[in-house]
């Protein structure tokens, strides 16, 4: 979806939009850390996030990769910066085609800074001289597909700011006229350069309106995190620093925490003033840091840590090709990135109902599904690599996870227990103690308010429902006991399969069981999570392979612990259990006296 449409839609509802900017890190570890940070920040619901294009096009490939992952894996509306520096038209079109094929609709069109080692911008052969040319090219070749954002400079472009820190009135007016040309050429949104004098920004907005620029103008806010970095950035951008800001910073410049606290205070007060003057959107330059940006938004009452809303039980995709997707199998609940990877080749995505089995079109299992950020790999090493002498030792690790003592799990891309799991963690501990090794679960829910902090989704003024669900590994003997117990519990359905494809089930292969649904005003019933045998048959390969790829392989070859884990993988069954009576049923009754 175009950012301009999202901003205008929120404005029509009387809401203020906010967004974050990130830049490509220099190291692989830095990229991993950035995506973990993005995951946390995107949970607060930014309207979009953008990723910069390195000076001189130095990060072109990485920017393209990060933008695509933001849109398709982090699931946030993404805007990619695109510059003219060192970019002949063929490279520009390659970048645009790449993001279009990945479902991205938003571009920030810039001239760009001079290449490394040069003082002035030089047009590359076969390329463009300015952002206006880039806007014209995008509109002429790609029509209305892309939303185009351009940069605005409240103090004028740094190139025309003199040694005295000011641009002449003639240069400032010329800059405004050039900005209007970019809008007239097809740009539909302006995001400004950083500033610290709010009055300058408000004057800039008024000056734009006076010459006929009517599109939204979004202020770019850069929280002060570090004194030297602040001076370096304002010096590079030739940004005016108000006297009172320097006076406040000077006594605390060597106290980094005090500088950050002042930066949060200043950013908050700047935003309050702009919001009071009718600004409807804020863009935060994060410098890949989260605390200051989030603190400002919390101070403004725009986000609340205790009320992170979800449109669905899983994060809704931002990819233009998946925006209507609203049904998924529960099996990948803790591995959403893997699910997105394995379904990226689909031409249509389920909407409203799961429909016919589509197992044949799941992507093949590959190394990609088991690749992990180094930080997560390290966490698994620290928490899960212990001497394992018996199955009881394995059970102990699962119990520790249910107790909340572990922040990682080989079967999860998420951190620790999810809020709804904590509702049933005492029962889960007992189940794991009996040798049923749980990897996925949800409690039963009967008409809980949709804004509940633990199980809510879909926004306010609705009610959500869940059937209790449990997924676990167990031995053949324990499975036989479960099957026997279920004969006296007709509301429970089960499926079980081992690595050798031996099935045990009391459901038909074509059965599709909705296990989560919601009721909202003026809408049909939404059922975003289902259980179906065909998808379970696909998932089971990934679940069994996780024993090796994400746990056993952390040990040296021939290590007894590694061998034990492989034995469990090769002999245990994966079991899916649903308690269909979500009002009076008790899924844990299956395990009583076992």
UniProtKB/Swiss-Prot annotation:
Annotated residues for binding of NAD(+): 21-26, 52-53
Pfam families: MTHFR (PF02219), MTHFR_C (PF21895)
Reaction it catalyzes: (6S)-5-methyl-5,6,7,8-tetrahydrofolate + NAD(+) = (6R)-5,10-methylene-5,6,7,8-tetrahydrofolate + NADH + H(+)
Alphabetized SUPFAM superfamilies for the sequence: FAD-linked oxidoreductase
Residues at the active site: 21
GO MF term list: methylenetetrahydrofolate reductase (NADH) activity
CDD domains named among the record's database cross-references: MTHFR
Activity control, per UniProt: Plant MTHFRs strongly prefer NADH over NADPH. Not inhibited by methionine or S-adenosylmethionine.
CC annotations in GO: cytosol
Keyword check for Oxidoreductase: yes
Gene3D superfamilies: 3.20.20.220
Pathway: One-carbon metabolism; tetrahydrofolate interconversion
UniProt EC number: 1.5.1.54
Protein transport among keywords: no
GO terms of biological process kind: methionine metabolic process; tetrahydrofolate interconversion
Binding-site residues for FAD, renumbered to this chain: 52-53, 81, 111-113, 153, 157-160, 175, 182
Entry keyword set: FAD, Flavoprotein, NAD, Oxidoreductase
Cofactor(s) the record lists: FAD
Chain positions recorded as substrate binding sites: 113, 193, 285
Function in brief: The probable reversibility of the MTHFR reaction in plants suggests that they can metabolize the methyl group of 5,10-methylenetetrahydrofolate to serine, sugars and starch.
Subunit field text: Homodimer.
Family: Belongs to the methylenetetrahydrofolate reductase family.
Protein name as it appears in the record: Methylenetetrahydrofolate reductase (NADH) 2
Organism: Arabidopsis thaliana
Chain's gene name: MTHFR2
């Amino acid at each position: 979806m175009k950012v301009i449409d999202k901003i205008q839609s929120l404005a029509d509802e009387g809401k203020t939009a906010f967004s974050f900017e990130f830049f490509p890190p220099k190291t692989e570890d830095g990229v991993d850390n950035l995506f973990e940070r993005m995951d946390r920040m995107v949970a607060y619901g930014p309207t979009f996030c953008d990723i910069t294009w390195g000076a001189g096009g130095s990060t072109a490939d990485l920017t393209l990769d990060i933008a695509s992952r933001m849109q398709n894996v982090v699931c946030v509306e993404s805007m990619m910066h695109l510059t003219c520096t060192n970019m002949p038209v063929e490279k520009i079109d390659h970048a645009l085609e790449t993001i279009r094929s990945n479902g991205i609709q938003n571009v920030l069109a810039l001239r760009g800074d001079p290449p490394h080692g040069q003082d002035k911008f030089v047009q590359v052969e076969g390329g463009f001289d300015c952002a206006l040319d880039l806007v014209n090219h995008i509109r002429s070749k790609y029509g209305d597909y892309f939303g185009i954002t351009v940069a605005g400079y409240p103090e004028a472009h740094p190139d025309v700011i003199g040694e005295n820190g000011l641009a002449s009135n003639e240069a400032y007016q010329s800059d405004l006229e050039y900005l209007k040309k970019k809008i007239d050429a097809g740009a539909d949104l302006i995001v400004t350069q950083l500033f610290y004098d709010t009055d300058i920004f408000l004057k800039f907005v008024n000056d734009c309106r006076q010459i006929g620029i009517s599109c939204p103008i979004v202020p770019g806010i850069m929280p002060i995190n570090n004194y030297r970095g602040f001076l370096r950035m304002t010096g590079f951008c030739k940004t005016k620093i108000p006297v009172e800001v320097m006076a406040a910073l000077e006594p605390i410049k060597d106290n980094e925490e005090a500088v950050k606290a002042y930066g949060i205070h200043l950013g908050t007060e700047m935003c309050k003033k702009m919001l009071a003057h009718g600004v409807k959107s804020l863009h935060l330059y994060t410098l890949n840091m989260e605390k200051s940006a989030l603190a400002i938004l919390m101070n403004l009452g725009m986000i609340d840590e205790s009320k992170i809303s979800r449109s669905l039980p899983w994060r809704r995709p931002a990819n233009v090709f998946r925006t209507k997707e609203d049904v998924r199998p529960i099996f990948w609940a803790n591995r959403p990135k893997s699910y997105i990877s394995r379904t990226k080749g689909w031409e249509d995505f389920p909407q409203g109902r799961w429909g016919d089995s589509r197992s044949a079109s799941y992507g093949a299992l590959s190394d990609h599904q088991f690749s992990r950020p180094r930080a997560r790999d390290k966490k698994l090493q620290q928490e899960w690599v212990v001497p394992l002498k018996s199955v009881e030792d394995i059970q102990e690790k699962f119990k520790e996870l249910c107790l909340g003592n572990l922040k990682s799990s080989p079967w999860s891309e998420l951190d620790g227990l999810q809020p709804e799991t904590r509702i049933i963690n005492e029962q889960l501990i007992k189940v794991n103690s009996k040798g049923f090794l749980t990897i996925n679960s949800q409690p039963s829910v009967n008409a809980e308010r949709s804004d509940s902090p633990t199980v809510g989704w879909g926004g306010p003024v609705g009610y959500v429902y869940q059937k209790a669900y449990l997924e676990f590994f167990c031995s053949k003997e324990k499975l036989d006991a479960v099957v026997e117990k279920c004969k006296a519990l007709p509301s429970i359905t089960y499926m079980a399969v081992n690595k050798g494809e031996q099935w045990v089930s009391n459901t038909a292969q074509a059965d599709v069981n909705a296990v989560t649904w919601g009721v909202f005003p003026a809408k049909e019933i939404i059922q975003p999570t289902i259980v179906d045998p065909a998808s379970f048959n696909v998932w089971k390969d990934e679940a069994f392979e996780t024993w090796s790829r994400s746990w056993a392989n952390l040990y040296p070859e021939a290590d007894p612990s590694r061998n034990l884990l492989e034995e469990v993988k090769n002999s245990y069954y994966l079991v899916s259990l649903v308690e269909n009576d979500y009002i009076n049923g008790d899924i844990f009754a299956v395990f009583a006296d076992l």
